[in-house]
Structures are given as C-alpha cells and as structure tokens.
Amino acid sequence: MVAKVYYEKAQSAKAEEALNWVIKSASEEGYRSLARLRLAGLMIDKGDFAQAKALLAEKVVAEFEPLVEDRLGDIDTLDKHSDTAKGHYLKSWRGLDAHAPYRKYVEAKLNAIGVDPTIDGTTSGVTSSSSKSTLESKDHQ
C-alpha cells in the first residue's frame, strides 16, 4: 500500500524501497510474491528488463504464477520477442480462471500479437459450469 502511494506521487525510488522491504521482511509468502510482481512492474516501466526477469524468476505462490507469465510476456513484447511473448501469455491465459476479469486482459494482449487462444478450445484446468450443464442436459434428452 505504501509503495502504491509513493508510485502515484512519482517517488519510484521510495516505492522500490518499500517493495524490497516487503520482499525481505514479510512473513507471508503471498505478500512477498505480490511485492515481487509489483516491483517487477516498476522495473519494466523503467526499462530494466534484466532486473524484472530476475524478480520474476523467484518462486511465487501458485496463484500468482499466471501473473508472472503475463509480466514475462510483457517484457518479451517490449523486447520485440513476440514468439516467446506468445508462450508466456498463453500460459497466463490458461492458468487464469475462465471467469477472472484479468483473463480478458491477457486475451487482448494475445489478440494484439495475432493469437486467438479460444480457437483450439483449450482451457487447461478450467471448468465451465454452463458447458457442463449443457452436456448433462443433452445426455438426458
């Protein structure tokens, strides 16, 4: 929270300091993971892709893995590596719940590089209650 305030006031050095403190000091891995993601975002904004990748290479809680892939895709897109960006964005899209609003954002990034993740119908690990109920109703007809 403190880092966000600093960032919004254009005090990125203080925001970085606050996020680094969380990474080193927080007792909860989720907080450390979130701080790494946010700090990586600041590094991407600064154009320091090497530092951003180093932060994203650290272990994060499983729930944040699709967001790490999204950030890696952003780096590769900015670095003009659309083939590897595609792979990262697809991993992110497939890792997010089908109903997560952020998934549409990742899908837009994929569309921007010429990829439609819905073409093959792969939703890897995601279940849709509406498709399940449709299948069940067809079985009973």
Language-model features: locations:
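Alpha-helical adaptor scaffolds
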Residues: 1-67, 72
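TPR/TPR-like alpha-solenoid helical repeat scaffolds
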Residues: 33-42, 67-79, 100-117
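Aromatic-residue detector
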Residues: 18-21, 54, 74-76, 94, ...
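Extracytoplasmic/luminal low-complexity segments enriched in Pro/Gly and acidic/polar residues
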Residues: 2, 98, 102-141
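TPR/TPR-like (Sel1-like) alpha-helical repeat modules
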Residues: 24-25, 60-62, 78-101, 107-111
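Alpha-helical linker/edge segments of TPR/alpha-solenoid repeat scaffolds
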Residues: 8-15, 41-52, 78-87, 111-129
